[in-house]
C-alpha cells in the first residue's frame, strides 16, 4: 500500500520537472506578454521564453544570485545571446520588500514565485502576497505560485482524510 501511495518513480526531480512544466503551460495560455519571475534562481524559463520577442521577461533575485547567473550565461555563446536580448533583463530585488515592482512598465504581467514561498513565515508570506496583489491591481495580469500553506488548504473529503491518515501511519518511523 505504501508503494501505491508513494510510487518510487515519483521522485523530487520528477515533481520539480512537472511543477516547472505546469507553470510553463499556464504562461503559454496566458495573454500576458510581460513576465516577472521573482526568485528565479537558475530557472531556464526566462532564457527560453525571451526567445519570442513578443514577451518582456524580467528575472528578479538577490544580488549574489543575479551576479552568478549573469557570469554563467556569459560563459557560453548561447548565454551571451540571451543576455543581449532587449526583452530579457536580470534584476536585483528583494522579495520581502518588492520595491522593484514599482519600476516595471504598466502592462498585464504574469508574476511567478516558484519554489520560494515555503521558506517564509506566515506573516512574511501574507505581506508578499499583498504586495503582488497590489501590483496586479495596477498592472493587471496573473500570479502563479506553487505553495499553499497547510492552514489554507480546503478541507479534505472523508476518503481523502482516511487515505491521508493511513499514509501517515504507514510512513511513521518505528519507535526507537
Which residue stretches match the model-derived regions?
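Alpha-helical subdomain
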Residues: 1-176
Amino acid at each position: 500500500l505504501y508503494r501505491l501511495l508513494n510510487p518510487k518513480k515519483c521522485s523530487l526531480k520528477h515533481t520539480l520537472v512537472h511543477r516547472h512544466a505546469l507553470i510553463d503551460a499556464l504562461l503559454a495560455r496566458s495573454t500576458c506578454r510581460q513576465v516577472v519571475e521573482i526568485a528565479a534562481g537558475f530557472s531556464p524559463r526566462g532564457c527560453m521564453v525571451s526567445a519570442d520577442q513578443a514577451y518582456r521577461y524580467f528575472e528578479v533575485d538577490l544580488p549574489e544570485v543575479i551576479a552568478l547567473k549573469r557570469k554563467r550565461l556569459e560563459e557560453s555563446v548561447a548565454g551571451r545571446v540571451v543576455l543581449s536580448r532587449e526583452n530579457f533583463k536580470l534584476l536585483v530585488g528583494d522579495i520581502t520588500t518588492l520595491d522593484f515592482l514599482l519600476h516595471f512598465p504598466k502592462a498585464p504581467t504574469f508574476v511567478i514565485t516558484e519554489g520560494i514561498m515555503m521558506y517564509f513565515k506566515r506573516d512574511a508570506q501574507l505581506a508578499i502576497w499583498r504586495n503582488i496583489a497590489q501590483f496586479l491591481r495596477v498592472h493587471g495580469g496573473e500570479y502563479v505560485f506553487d505553495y499553499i500553506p497547510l492552514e489554507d488548504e480546503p478541507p479534505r473529503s472523508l476518503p481523502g482524510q482516511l487515505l491521508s491518515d493511513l499514509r501517515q501511519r504507514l510512513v511513521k518511523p518505528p519507535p526507537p
